[in-house]
Amino acid sequence: MSESSIKIENVVASTKLAEEFDLTVIESEFEGAEYNKQKFPGLVYRVSDPKAAFLVFTSGKVVCTGTKNVADVHTVVGNLAKKLNSIGIKTIENPQITVQNIVASADLHTILNLNAIAIGLGLENIEYEPEQFPGLVYRIDEPKVVVLIFSSGKLVVAGGKSPEDCERSVEVVRQQLDSMGLL
């Protein structure tokens, strides 16, 4: 990966921490928790170390977003479970945490000709309408991700389930552009 530097920007993961939650109890006990079921069916709770946000639902399901790596997801979910336990809410031990989406950025460190890339990659896999969006949208089947390619050489990878998916997708793009003589 020497030609590109990959940085994870956001990890979204989900888990089930209990059979059900009383969100009004959590809102009253957790400082900064926000719950307004007329606006949104879940409780929003933010933490700062490591930085993350939770969507907590009455079903016992929790969505965690905002961390920069998968290890931090496990840390903050564990901390949330401990905090719930501390206010008398029993949680599932060792909950299964599923990464739903990883967004990463990368830089190929070169200016790219998006018109040539659009033709070279084939119109069936890309969307490129520069009047509407300055990037080229490239859908890759393996790993199944979407890569936004910008003329600056910057890439945004969305849809990865692991950091390795993001790294592989950047390598796929780099190799394809290189093989077309566009790097």
From Swiss-Prot:
Molecular functions per Gene Ontology: DNA binding; DNA-binding transcription factor activity
GO BP term (any one): DNA-templated transcription initiation
PROSITE patterns: TFIID
InterPro entries tied to this protein: TBP (IPR000814), TBP_archaea (IPR033711), TBP_CS (IPR030491), TBP_dom_sf (IPR012295)
UniProt xrefs under Gene3D superfamilies: TATA-Binding Protein
Source taxon at top rank: Archaea
Sequence repeats: from-to residues: 8-84, 99-177
CDD domains: TBP_archaea
Keyword annotations of the record: DNA-binding, Repeat, Transcription, Transcription regulation
Similarity annotation: Belongs to the TBP family.
Role, per record: General factor that plays a role in the activation of archaeal genes transcribed by RNA polymerase. Binds specifically to the TATA box promoter element which lies close to the position of transcription initiation.
HAMAP family found in the cross-reference section: TATA_bind_prot_arch
Identification of the protein by name: TATA-box-binding protein 1
